[in-house]
Amino acid sequence: MNAFDVAIVGGGPAGSACAWKLRQSGLDVVVIDKAVFPRDKLCAGWITPQVLDDLDIDPNEYRQGRTFQAITGFRVGVIGNGDTVDASYGRAVSFGIRRCEFDHYLLCRSRARLRLGTAIASIRRDGSRWVIDEAISAPMLVGAGGHFCPVARMLDGSPDRAPRVAAQEVELPIDRKGCAVGGEAPELYFCPDFKGYGWCFRKGDYVNVGFGRVDWRALPEATNRFVTFLKTTGRMAADPSTWRWRGHAYLLAGFRQRRAVGDAVLLAGDACGLAYPQSGEGIRPAIESGLMAASTIVNASGRYTRDRLEPYGRQVRERFGSGMMGHLLSQLVPDGMSSGVALRLLDTPWFVRRIVLDRWFLHARDAALV
């Protein structure tokens, strides 16, 4: 049996950020993941400068040998309508990354001990310690394994009744003659009913195309309409019948978060259901919650009772709680009025820049973690 101070299930941004912070305090940490890194992880993949600050990442160091695309603007429109709004910032407000590179970098940088390629079969308590697969033990457990995290299932049960987003994505080597999307300006196209959006994002030698929707049953049909729209408007010339789509699901913050805290256990990132409800982005909430979890664990000084860990639960509710739900785009207008209102709102430069981009996608007004 290998003993550690903290066991983290999940090596994505939430788990890596938590491990990195815990290692700075001298704790012996193991990260367990069923994947072998670098892993094939599709994601629109842009991060704000705040993420770099939170993790003390030097952009010049990170970009050595990795994709790091400066984003200085966006193009926003409605699927089925040719009119768009171009918003230019004149400076880098986000950076495009490839998750296969970014996640591997964070995990290696954490300096945690790694158990990769390990699908967890059992988690149980033995006195004051958690025992994982009868091979690893630790007094403190963090679940950061995404939507289907086994720690989340153990702590909170099935999330099947909670509203969730379903998404499909594909990442392709770029055909510069067949892609009209500019590298510094990702393109976002919303459904007329505001219940989903598609994106087209060029990053270095790759382009990521994806579509996400709250109403998951309508996802295949809506995705087909989006892809057809990209072809008819000349944004993408590639034959979509050859694309290998990857699907995933996640919970939105503010609807029905999973229980984040138990005795000697915390959830972080998508395992806790923290994706931003407006954009579906999960990278920044994952990293912030991982750092918050680590600080709570350190402050608990080895006494991991639920009441000692509850400050983390309060932080999660305050930063990612129900206040976000009211900003969901689909709630702004009644269903019967959505199409016309969508066209008017998303054809208004002020609304696109100040609300859709600054507030919902860039979270420019969000306070930095202390």
Question: Where in this protein do the model-derived segments appear?
Answer:
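A conserved beta-strand/loop capping segment in the N-terminal third of enzymes
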Residues: 46-105
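FAD/FMN-dependent oxidoreductases across multiple families
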Residues: 122, 217-297
